[in-house]
Amino acid sequence: SGAVHFSFTKFSTSSSDLTLQGSALVSSKGSLKKNPSKKGKPVDHSVGRALYRSPIHIWDETTGKVASFDATFSFVSEAPAIPMLFPSSKGELNDEDDTRIGGQLGVVNDSYNVIRVTVAVENDGYRNRVDPSARPHISLPIKSVRSKKTAKWNMQTGKVGTAHISYNSVAKRLSAVVSYTGNSSSTTVSYDVLLNLAVLPSKVLVGKTATGLYKDHVETNTILSWSFTSKLKTNSIAD
């Protein structure tokens, strides 16, 4: 079987497993920051991305079998606004495009055309023209910035939260659960989808992105930890 596992309990600029783009940086305390502030003020028109260095094999071209995966982030949102994401994207993400606007999720262009094949879990504190009425919300955009499923999100600024994203390839279900330390309630959203050629290439990049447009609606996003596990079953005896 094809299994992948990685875990960042702290982040380091010397890590060869992590690719930082745009405004993303590692703090002196080992946390990952996207859209960090300058002189105490968040930076608008910015996008920060953190990607695992190697593409993940998400489905097998020969058998058509699809991987199951689990990803967990612990985070602190320091100002209400634009999204945190878990994207699976094809190809390199460069910094010289027009994906910096919040509604673009850091992966589509200014005309809202999908320029990279994307499956995302979005935690969004700001409502724009493609968003549902719920604000803040958690949603599942698939090959589009318009979400397939959405749930109202009880965003708690400055508190440590945990986002757990999973895909069950047997049930064909993509799910996200967000909760906060010391709070028994959580927000859950799920959508049934087969992550095959119709949705994603066989190998994808996994990571996290945060975007910001206006000065009053920029989320300074701190990631404390990130873990990911996937397993793609094949027809080998080892399975």
From Swiss-Prot:
UniProt subcellular location: Vacuole, Aleurone grain; Vacuole
Positions with a binding annotation for Mn(2+): E122, D124, D131, H137
The keyword Metal-binding belongs to this UniProt entry's keyword annotation: yes
Tissue localization of expression: Seed.
Binding annotation for Ca(2+): D124, Y126, N128, D131
UniProt keyword terms in alphabetical order: Calcium, Lectin, Manganese, Mannose-binding, Metal-binding, Vacuole
A Pfam family annotated for this UniProt entry: Lectin_legB
Any GO molecular function: metal ion binding
InterPro entries to which the protein is assigned, alphabetical: ConA-like_dom_sf, L-lectin, Legume_lectin_dom, Leguminous_Lectin
A GO-annotated cellular component: vacuole
Principal subcellular localization: other
Subunit structure: Homotetramer.
Role played: Lactose-binding lectin. Also binds derivatives of galactose, glucose, lactose, and mannose. Binds O-glycoproteins such as mucins more strongly than N-glycoproteins. Shows agglutinating activity towards rabbit erythrocytes.
Further remarks about this protein from its record: Binds one manganese (or another transition metal) ion and one calcium ion. The metal ions are essential for the saccharide-binding and cell-agglutinating activities.
Family: Belongs to the leguminous lectin family.
Protein name: Lactose-binding lectin-2
Species the sequence originates in: Cymbosema roseum (Dioclea purpurea)
